[in-house]
Structures are given as structure tokens and as C-alpha cells.
Amino acid sequence: MSKKYCYLFTEGNANMRELLGGKGANLAEMTNIGLPVPQGFTITTEACTQYYEDGRQINDEIFAEIMEYVEKMEKITGKKFGDLHNPLLVSVRSGARASMPGMMDTILNLGLNEDVVNVIAEKSNNPRWAWDCYRRFIQMYSDVVMEVGKKYFEQLIDQMKEKKGVTLDVELTADDLKELAGQFKAEYKAKIGEEFPTDPKEQLMGAIKAVFRSWDNPRANVYRRDNDIPYSWGTAVNVQSMAFGNMGDDCGTGVAFTRNPATGEKKLMGEFLTNAQGEDVVAGVRTPMPIAEMAEKFPEAFKQFEDVCKILEDHYRDMQDMEFTVEHGKLYMLQTRNGKRTPAAALKIACDLVDEGMIDEKKAVAMIEPRSLDTLLHPQFDTEVLKKTPVIGKALPASPGAACGKIVFSAEDAKAWKERGEKVVLVRLETSPEDIEGMKASQGILTVRGGMTSHAAVVARGMGKCCVSGCGDIKMDEENKQFELAGKVYHEGDWLSIDGSTGNIYDGAVPTVDASIGGEFGRVMGWADKYRRLGVRTNADNPHDTAQAVKFGAEGIGLCRTEHMFFEADRIPAIREMICADTLEQREKALAKLEPMQQGDFEAMYIALEGRPMTVRFLDPPLHEFVPTEEADIELLAKDMGKSVAEIKNIIASLHEFNPMMGHRGCRLAVTFPEIAAMQTRAVIKAALNVNAAHPEWHIVPEIMIPLVGEVKELKYVKDVVVKTADEIISSVKSDMKYKVGTMIEIPRAALTADEIAKEADFFSFGTNDLTQMTFGFSRDDAGKFLGAYYDKKIYENDPFAKLDQVGVGKLVKMAATMGRESNPDIHLGICGEHGGDPASVEFCHKVGLDYVSCSPFRVPIARLAAAQAAIREET
């Protein structure tokens, strides 16, 4: 049997979203439950997919079926396309299975031409309405289908109003609108080079193709990438007979929500316009009245609408967003969908629906978008002020929150200005580990280069700092401490505001409001913890971030990057001394200075964790990241070391690597300098012993992680150093404290030989940042240069550094997990890359049976919710 590409509203239901899209499925469902819906049909998402497979053409089979359904629609309505006695007019709307802003706008009044206008003008005894419909249709069709900009038509309307001495569109007469329709058609011909189509079926096919085309427009592609909507889904098209809200004062149109979408309050909220068509409310051409006032104008229709709202909310068991029209006092429902809402409203609605007995806890957990929680945890801009503030630039929303401060161009200045009590925004070409102190001191970070997983983005997310990255429009002049953006030069000390949730950049200081986490947040998180199987830890390397993560529900630390501790101002001289040492004795002398500092850090972390586990990753980055680059710092180091500047410069030059990502780093440092691993082991073990002595009830078991292992013999060599050092210390104090030694799986070879490595490891932690780099063979710092082209050409749909590539990298993770468990059934498995806070990646980790995910502190609630949703989905 051949595939069916069209469905009448009477043939579908709410469960057919994949085929009919959200709008089509809900129109069918409203029809099924007996609500007043203008009838029509839906062209399926499969027809859209076929359109692209056929080289952006609607094939003969689909065309014939559309025409067949036009005839069915004509029979149902008793009206015909182009008929001069009873003409059929329709709206054409897009409708993907997930709501997608940026898709094609609606086309209303399709089916009109000069002959039909004259007929409906006479039949309705309302020529003004008829010509208003026609000029709207010409304008919409030209804009939406043929991409002739709205502005050309708006200019003609303004000229007509000026000529007639009126200020509002509604004051134009039938003759004015008829003249305007003629001008619109002339404008169409001038821009397109052909006459405006008069055949309703030609108009319909043009509109359907435009809907399909809009699935692949730049706005839609960006939205899909940001919201995990696959390109392969396609969009449906809804062809619906018109209900007219613009036939007179006993007509109108409106949009309403069954609950307040901003607060979640259980109260009907919406707007209504008399004598208007749908897009007038949305476009803000006229100021609508609150929905409550509709009761005075149309008491019967309003009473019916209130009943419909209750029916729909009870039916869908969620807050509904509805569009409706009143034609001569009669109500017609044009659309319903689960309404978009603020994160705070989402939590309140979920809890209220549970309390009202409408849904259970699992449904409440499942209905909240995990990533939306991000905005609840960070300061936000005052929305009222934001409406009046122009956007001067837009880049990648790398770490959420809002920040405003005075511009500084270096980490040193950021620190110095903060110490003076100033709020600053750090603006850099790109950030490096040396900038961490400056990033901490800043309200937010703005970079010219780098993507969502650049150094700035990753570190900012870990700190809970706002970050906007990759603003290539900035012309940077670091030397003179200034940059140019949107035609204006900004100097050090000028005020700037950035929004890490949208990527928007604003001139001046936009006031912020603190995030507030209500009681509903705690309730929903409690439910999430009840149903999830996957543990959630955090990536943290200081007590402040640790305490923050514990507050957000982290069950321990999955990644403590020890190198971040070395960048503190009081430690960097000692690490540089170690790097520049000529002998083992000199190195050990420098390491002896670092050891008590590291031990102190670990003790503070263990105290903040209150007995929760912590995985400490030994030194990972290449040594060149620690050496000075500024002349003054080089001279200072030479003086401290008793060496000449030339000698220090030679040492620095010798550390240069052509590909440091794959160079002398990770366990390779511990193999060449085992004394580093020994020092770090002493610091971890002594810290744990001290804290255990003070808090015996915590039973701390240190977890030591060796990074960048690719060969089991590497792990064995470094592990021997760790075990020898740890056992000596533990036995010297007659303790029976246990500890674990594990490794990161971040090199493909480690994943492929996981069975061998598991014999020497107590745990695996998948470092998916490096595993992604090495599997794809590109550096995450450089990938931004070409990934945009890959998205445009549909080679990749997502940034593999933000969303785990389940086909390639995921296969390695799954293989390593399976082989590791077969070889060592007691092995503990986790993931600690940035992917640990991405909901789709969390679901993958649940499916492959990992024990925990670890992510930055502010992503912990997201991971907890995503883990619960994965478990709930698996049950159903």
C-alpha cells in the first residue's frame, strides 16, 4: 500500500505528532473531543522529507493526494476554491513535532483573487472587510512565500494613511484598501517580475513549498541545533478553512494561556482584539485588551471559551497556549499546545498539577526541560529595562547569567580593579589558564575567539560566571586597551553588559536581579533524586565551587583538576622553579614548597565535601602552560633561580611543542618526573588522613586519577609510584585508610584496550573532552573555524564538544565500559567531560550503565533532572 501523505483533522489524534506535527495532531485531537475547530487537513512530515529527497520538489504522487484532500475539504465545508458563489478561503501554517520559533509565518485568506473579493464583498455586505482580507493576503504571500520584505508594503500603507489623513489601519475605507491591493500587486510584479497568482491551487502549492523550505532556513537550523531537534524530523503543513475575526465589531481574535506563563499562577491569561485577524495580536499593530474584557464584549463566546480552556487543560494535563477567533459571536479554536513558560513557572505548574491530582511525580519530573534550570541559578537582567536597551552585538551564549561591569583587557587589571571595589567585565581575544584569577574577579567574560567549549566557556561554567564567547565582530586593540563594536569604540573603564543565556551584548550598565530558587525547585529535585539511578558529581577544584555544588545536590567530586591550584599567585613561582630545575634535588626542593599548599587545598576540599568522595586528577597540562611569557616575569624568575635571562628563555623554548594537546602532558609527565606524582600522592593522602582524624565518621577514601593513559604499562608505572608513596605514609601513622587508583579514558587506544587497563584500575572516568578531540582528530580550540560550515552543509548537526557523539565517541565509551566490567566486575565508571551536564549525553550514560556523571557545579541540577528523566523514559 502506498504511503499516506495527507490526513483530515477527523483522521488524526494527539499521538500522531511525529507524522502530523504538534499543531496538526492537536487540531485533530480538538476535533475528536468535539471542540469548534474550522476543518481542514494536514500534510505530513514525511511529505516534507520526501520534498528534500526529491531535490526540493513536490512529486506527482504527493501533489495528487493534496488535490484529492482539497476536494474532500471542499465537500466538508460546502465551499470551493475560486468558486464565485461560495468560495473556500484557507490558512496555511507550518507545524513541526516540536514548537519551533523561526519557522514559516502563517498565511491567511489564501484563495482570494479579484473575482472572489468582489463576490465576498457583496455576499457579506462588507466590502471593507473583503478588501482588507485581500491586501493582507497579498502582503503575507509576498513576504512569506516569495520573500519580498514586509517593509515595502508597510511603506505603501503609511503613504496611503498619510494621503487620507488618518493614523490607524482600521480608519482606511474599502476604496482605500482596494487601491492599496492594486499597489501591492504592482509592488509584487516589480520585485518578482510576474503577476500575483490568481489561481487558488497555485497559491496553495506555493505556500506549501514555502513551509517545507522554511524547515531549512538559517533561523530554523540554529534553533534546531540549540534544542536538539533532528533535521530528519521535517515539518508538517496545516491547511485550515478560515474563521474571520475581522468582519466587524462582533468579531475578534485572541491568544490565551490557561495559567500564567511567567509565574505559573492558575489564572486564565491572554489578550484579545476586536475586528482583527490573528497576526494583529502577535505583531502588536494595535494594543489588545486583556482576555477578561472579552467577557463584556462577547459574554456567550467568553463563557464557551472558559469551558474549552478547562476541557483542554484536563485533557492534556498541562498548561495550554491557545489561539482562537470569534466570528459574529461564534467561537472557533485555531490551535492549542503545551504552553512555553519560564523555568520558575514550569516548576510551579508541575508541583500544582501534582497537588491537583492531575499528574504524578514522574510526569512532573518528565515535563521540565532540564537546561531551563540553568537560568534559575544565575543573576538575570531586569526584563523591563532590557526591552528598551539596544543589542550592539551577538555571539555564543557560553555560560548563562547576566553581567555588567567596566571593561578591562587583562586578568591583572581585573584583579586590581576588583580590589578597588569596581565591577568589571573581562574582554579578551581568548582566555588561557593564566587568566583564571582575572576571570574569578570579573562579573563576566567576553571573548573574540572560541566556542561553547573553549577554555573561557568551560572555566566560566565551572565558576558559575556569565560568559559570551566568539564575538568575531569585535575589532580588538589590546595594546591601546580598546575595541570597536557596532561602529563605536569602547575603552577601558566603559560600562558593558553581557547576557550569557542569549549571547547578547549591550552598551552601558543594564541592572541585574538575583536568581531566586523557590520551594518548588527543591520539591522537583527531590522527586528527580527518587527516580534516578545515575549518580551526579561535580567538577571542582576549590572549596567555594565545591560548597556551591553540594548545595545544588552534588554527591561528590568526579574531577578535581590539580593544575588549577598551581595557577594561584603564591604557587606559580614554585611550579616555575620546579620546571626550570636542572637536577632531581632542585626539583624536589621546589615540589617541597608546593606540597603543603596542595595538602591544604585538599583538606579544605574534603571538609567542604563532608565525607563525599573526591577524584583527584594528577597534573595534566603540558608544562609550557606554567612558564612566564612577559619579559618582567621572565626576569623575576631568572633572579629567583640564580640563572641568566638567556638560560630561562632557553628552558622556555625547549618546552615548546608543535602539538601540545598530544605532547608531554598527563601521565607522560609522571613517567618522566615521577617525583611530581609522589608529591601529589603525599598531599592527597596526608590531607585525607588529617581530615579523617578530625572527622572519623566521614570514612574518606581518596580516589587518585592518572590522566591520559593510552597503554596499561604507563598506568602500572605511575600506579607503583602512587602505591609505594601512599602505603609508606599510611603505615607510618598506623592507619587502615583505604584509597583507590584509577585512570581517565580519554585516548582511543585506552578505550580499545580497556580490558587490560581495568586489571590495574579501581575506576574509569571518561574524559570526553579529549576523547572527542582525539577520536575526531580536531582540536576543540580550532574547530570553531570550520564547524559552522559543517552545520550549514549538514555534515554535523551538533557541536560534538557540547553533545556527545554517540555514534563514534559513544561507541568507544560503551566498548570500554563493557570490556572494563568483564575484566574487573568491581570497577566504578563515570564521565567527567563537559558532556556530563548535557541532558542527551546524560541519557546516553544512563543507557550504557555508567555509575555517575560529573559536571560543573551550576549544571548539577540539570544532570540530576536529566538522569531521572532517562530512568523514567526507560521504564515506559
Residue ranges with predicted function:
Residues 41, 448-450, 469-472, 560, ...:
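Short beta->alpha connector loops at strand-helix junctions that form conserved
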Residues 93, 517, 527-876:
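Conserved alpha/beta-domain cores
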Residues 238, 408, 425-427, 446, ...:
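Structural motif
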Residues 330-332, 429-440, 444-446, 452-458, ...:
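Glycine-rich phosphate/ribose-binding loops and adjacent secondary-structure elements
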Residues 334-336, 491-539, 545:
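C-terminal domain-closing interface element
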Residues 358-442, 504-510, 521, 525-529, ...:
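Protease-associated
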